[in-house]
Amino acid sequence: MQLITTENKLAGSKKALEIIEKGITSGEVNTLGLATGSTPETLYAELVKSDVDTKNVTTTNLDEYVGLAANDPNSYHYYMNELLFSKKAFKESFLPNGEATDAEAECARYEEILSEHPIDIQVLGIGTNGHIGFNEPGTPFDSLTHKVVLTDSTREANKRFFEREEDVPTHAYSMGIKSIMNAKKIILLAFGENKAQAIKETIKGPVDVNCPASVLQNHPDVTVILDNEAASLL
């Protein structure tokens, strides 16, 4: 596990972009795994400005809310299109289908996509409770793509994106921890003081399902990029 501490979110995002650009330019990155939320927004803005050619790169996404259409402004389809896909050309892009009526079939479909497009670099954020994707504390490490019941803390953290609290979805489709760990390389981004405790448990704590991100200690190629605040408890 390589640890990089930077001055702020912009510097950290640029450092992540350097790794991604190098992988794409060298031809080592054919599939790029993407995350959502506030953490990677600056990375995507920098990627849009970058000269790196992504038209032969396939993207996959970690998760999507259950029940939200792709054109819903709160869906991750919409988020990705607004921040990245409408501004940068990729070969093809895959996300779970939030409108799928058969959850089991949708999870199997997405796992098939992941097997056809092995992830070369997976970008991750981390929740204040240590979740990666929507894999909440207690999620088995051998989990594949599955339908998740969102915890109160995760819904609380995400309610700022919705007009009303009751509009925050209760479920999501998420790549499982095993699905994430199958990526050849992982870049974990964390910025801000509110992520410091989760980062401490991820890097220095035991590998335990109560902090899902701690499993990254077992991955052969992880780069953790922090700002000074997120690194403050290390």
UniProtKB/Swiss-Prot annotation:
The active site is at 63 (proton acceptor), 129 (for ring-opening step), 131 (proton acceptor), 136 (for ring-opening step). InterPro entries: Glc/Gal-6P_isomerase, Glucosamine6P_isomerase, Glucosamine6P_isomerase_CS, NagB/RpiA_transferase-like. The keyword Hydrolase applies. GO terms for molecular function: glucosamine-6-phosphate deaminase activity; identical protein binding. It is an enzyme of class 3 (hydrolase). Transmembrane segments: none annotated. Its EC number is 3.5.99.6. It catalyses: alpha-D-glucosamine 6-phosphate + H2O = beta-D-fructose 6-phosphate + NH4(+). The keyword GTP-binding does not apply. Pathway: Amino-sugar metabolism; N-acetylneuraminate degradation; D-fructose 6-phosphate from N-acetylneuraminate: step 5/5. One of its GO terms (cellular component) is cytoplasm. GO terms for biological process: carbohydrate metabolic process; glucosamine catabolic process; N-acetylglucosamine catabolic process; N-acetylneuraminate catabolic process. It holds the Pfam family Glucosamine_iso. This is Glucosamine-6-phosphate deaminase. It comes from Listeria monocytogenes serotype 4b (strain CLIP80459).
